[in-house]
């Protein structure tokens, strides 16, 4: 289906803050619900059938320093499936050290928007391993932990980063992130239509119908956090929805 995934994937999120797994509402600090040890969570998702894990260092996203590096290292050592990581990856050296350490794909957000040449540089050195994260609120790309609006259209940005060599786009709809209120597929569809590389959809997934919609819309995968941690459905059920087509 894509160069990143053999078929549509439902990817569990392991978002880390202060050493715990957390889920935030619309990315806002102070809204977090905590779900315990990241390594335990990662192992549980592997046992549940995950084919990829999505790790986010939220302290890195907010502060710019990778505060959960120890947990990331432990997860890499503990699981035998591909791991993609975002949050606080600001420089080529940051990305290279993670890729060399065993992270399969790094996700560049703020750093990519502020310095697109970084994407091109890394994509040349690590082809197929650089994902650009585009987070949008009110139809505009936001950066710095979703706190600053750029005025950039996410579909336009996605096309530009595809040209720069990104192997995929992680698109997060901040307007619905963490609210368990369902997705806004039209926004995601615009990004999918703008590029020929895989788009991983994130934000607002609350039901199996949401997953089916994203699959039908053309997403290569979806990252799911709150809905899985709150037992709205199981990972097995979510994966089965897309395998039954």
UniProtKB/Swiss-Prot annotation:
| Statement: the UniProt record of this protein carries the keyword Kinase | no
- Which Pfam families is this protein grouped with? His_biosynth
GO MF annotation: an example: 1-(5-phosphoribosyl)-5-[(5-phosphoribosylamino)methylideneamino]imidazole-4-carboxamide isomerase activity
Q: Where in the cell is it found?
A: Cytoplasm
Extract the PANTHER family matched here.
Answer: 1-(5-PHOSPHORIBOSYL)-5-[(5-PHOSPHORIBOSYLAMINO)METHYLIDENEAMINO] IMIDAZOLE-4-CARBOXAMIDE ISOMERASE
Highest taxon of the lineage: Archaea
Pathway listed for it? Amino-acid biosynthesis; L-histidine biosynthesis; L-histidine from 5-phospho-alpha-D-ribose 1-diphosphate: step 4/9
Instruction: Kindly give the InterPro entries that the UniProt entry links to this protein.
Output: Aldolase_TIM (IPR013785), His_biosynth (IPR006062), HisA_bact_arch (IPR006063), Isoase_HisA-like (IPR044524), Isoase_HisA-like_bact (IPR023016), RibuloseP-bd_barrel (IPR011060)
Family of the protein in this entry: Belongs to the HisA/HisF family.
Q: Which reaction does it catalyse?
A: 1-(5-phospho-beta-D-ribosyl)-5-[(5-phospho-beta-D-ribosylamino)methylideneamino]imidazole-4-carboxamide = 5-[(5-phospho-1-deoxy-D-ribulos-1-ylimino)methylamino]-1-(5-phospho-beta-D-ribosyl)imidazole-4-carboxamide
Protein name per Swiss-Prot or TrEMBL: 1-(5-phosphoribosyl)-5-[(5-phosphoribosylamino)methylideneamino] imidazole-4-carboxamide isomerase
Q: Which UniProt keywords apply?
A: Amino-acid biosynthesis, Cytoplasm, Histidine biosynthesis, Isomerase
**Which CDD domains does the record match to this protein?**
HisA
Main location (coarse class): cytoplasm
Q: What is its EC class?
A: isomerase
EC number(s) in its UniProt entry? 5.3.1.16
Q: Which GO terms describe its cellular component?
A: cytoplasm
Q: Active site annotated at which positions?
A: 15 (proton acceptor), 135 (proton donor)
Gene3D superfamilies, per database record = Aldolase class I
């Amino acid at each position: 289906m894509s160069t990143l995934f053999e078929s549509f994937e439902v990817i569990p999120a392991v978002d880390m803050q202060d050493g715990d797994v957390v889920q935030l509402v619309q990315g806002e600090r102070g809204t977090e619900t905590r779900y315990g040890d990241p390594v335990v969570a990662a192992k549980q998702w592997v046992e549940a059938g995950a084919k990829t894990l999505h790790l986010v260092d939220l302290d890195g996203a907010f502060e710019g320093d990778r505060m959960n590096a120890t947990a990331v290292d432990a997860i890499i050592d503990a699981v035998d499936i591909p791991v993609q990581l975002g949050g606080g990856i600001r420089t080529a050296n940051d990305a290279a050290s993670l890729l060399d350490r065993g992270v399969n794909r790094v996700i560049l957000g703020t750093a990519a928007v502020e310095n697109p040449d970084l994407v091109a540089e890394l994509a040349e050195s690590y082809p197929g391993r650089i994902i650009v994260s585009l987070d949008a609120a009110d139809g505009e790309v936001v950066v710095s932990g979703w706190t600053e609006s750029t005025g950039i259209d996410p579909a336009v940005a996605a096309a530009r980063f595809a040209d720069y060599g990104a192997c995929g786009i992680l698109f997060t709809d901040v307007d619905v992130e963490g609210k368990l209120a369902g997705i806004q597929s039209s926004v995601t569809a615009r990004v999918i239509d703008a590029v020929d590389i895989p788009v991983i959809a994130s934000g607002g997934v609350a039901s199996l119908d949401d997953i089916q919609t994203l699959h039908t819309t053309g997403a290569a995968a979806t990252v799911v956090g709150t809905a899985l941690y709150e037992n709205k459905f199981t990972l097995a059920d979510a994966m089965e929805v897309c395998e039954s087509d």
